[in-house]
UniProtKB/Swiss-Prot annotation:
Organism: Clostridium botulinum (strain 657 / Type Ba4)
Record key words, sorted: Porphyrin biosynthesis, Transferase
InterPro entries membership: HemC, Porphobilin_deaminase_N, Porphobilinogen_deaminase_C, Porphobilinogen_deaminase_C_sf
GO MF assignments: hydroxymethylbilane synthase activity
GO cellular component, one term: cytoplasm
Subunit record text: Monomer.
Free-text comment on the cofactor: Binds 1 dipyrromethane group covalently.
Family per record: Belongs to the HMBS family.
Matching HAMAP family: Porphobil_deam (MF_00260)
Reactions mediated catalytically: 4 porphobilinogen + H2O = hydroxymethylbilane + 4 NH4(+)
Protein name: Porphobilinogen deaminase
Record-listed S-(dipyrrolylmethanemethyl)cysteine modification sites: C237
Additional note from the record: The porphobilinogen subunits are added to the dipyrromethane group.
Length: 290
């Protein structure tokens, strides 16, 4: 049996797809090949994502490939997947999640706490920018786009003091040795689904059940809880929004942030993990009442 897996062209996207292909090979001895696709989000690099407009900038072109039967499935970073799935598509599996934290990479290995006043920090994420300002209101936030390696190179090219990137992506492309600092998930709440990969298929695909074996239950329900939080707040790449769900002894804890009326609101909630979706919704409701 041969599967074609669609993914973005970036090195990180290809590495992430190789992770899924390796898991499939181990479980089912299935031969897979990658179909590389350049998405709208990949093509427009000079403009920040929130100004391009629309949802699913890194996903839609890949879904077209599945609709046209050029691919059997797709691998996404779950943080790129809109909470509303198009009709006929589903996330069939979410394997075990990687490190969810954000990392700081500086030019001369200077710790975040030791940055000079007015230091220039590169990020195009509204979520990261807002939380950086809460930690250090003096920081100068500089928008940067591009793949992981491109952003790292921009530290020198654009005379930045440092940049913020996801730990998971750095680990997957073996660049985590460059990390200067790790942000705690309470001081820098991650993006919805950060560190998690999702396998998307068409609901009618005859072999879709083969992917279900790759599902990691606790990782999946944590991501689904975060996505319920995002859905209730109608969040997307235009929003300053983040959430992180974790599980200990069947108890789920979720921390979430959202910008409302020009104010960053941060709330937490705890409950039994079988109520994961209700917890995400309840956390959003707490924020809306603030």
């Amino acid at each position: 049996m041969n599967f074609i897996i669609a993914t973005r062209r970036s090195k990180l996207a290809q590495v992430q797809t190789e992770i899924i292909i390796d898991l499939l090979n181990k479980k089912h001895d299935i031969e897979c090949e990658k179909l590389l696709i350049e998405t709208v989000g990949d093509k427009i690099l000079e403009v920040s994502l929130d100004k391009i407009g629309g949802k699913g900038l890194f996903v839609k072109d890949i879904e077209v490939a599945m609709l046209e039967q050029r691919a059997d499935a797709a691998v996404h970073s779950m943080k790129d997947v809109p909470y509303e799935m198009p009709k006929g598509f589903e996330i069939i599996a979410i394997p075990e999640r990687e490190d969810v934290r954000d990392a700081f990479i500086s030019l001369d290995n200077i710790k975040f706490k030791d940055l000079r006043e007015g230091a220039k920090i590169g990020t195009s994420s509204r979520r990261r920018a807002a939380q950086l300002k809460l930690l250090r209101s003096d920081l100068d936030i500089v928008p940067i786009r591009g793949n992981v390696q491109t952003r790292i190179e921009k530290i020198k090219k654009e005379n930045l003091d440092g940049i913020i990137l996801a730990v998971a992506g750095l680990k997957r492309v073996n660049l985590d040795h460059l990390i200067t600092d790790y942000f705690d998930t309470k001081e820098m709440v991650p993006a919805i689904g950060q560190g998690a990969l999702g396998i998307e298929v068409m609901e009618e695909h005859p072999k879709k059940e083969l992917f279900k074996d790759l599902d990691h239950y606790n990782s999946k329900i944590c991501v689904l809880a975060e996505r319920a939080f995002m859905r209730e707040l109608d969040g997307d790449c235009h929003s300053t929004i983040g959430a992180y769900a974790s599980i200990k002894d069947n108890i789920m804890h979720i921390i979430g942030i959202f910008e409302r009326k020009n104010k960053i609101i941060k709330k937490e909630i705890t409950g039994t993990k079988d109520q994961y979706e209700k917890l995400g919704i309840a956390l959003a409701e707490h924020i809306l009442k603030d």
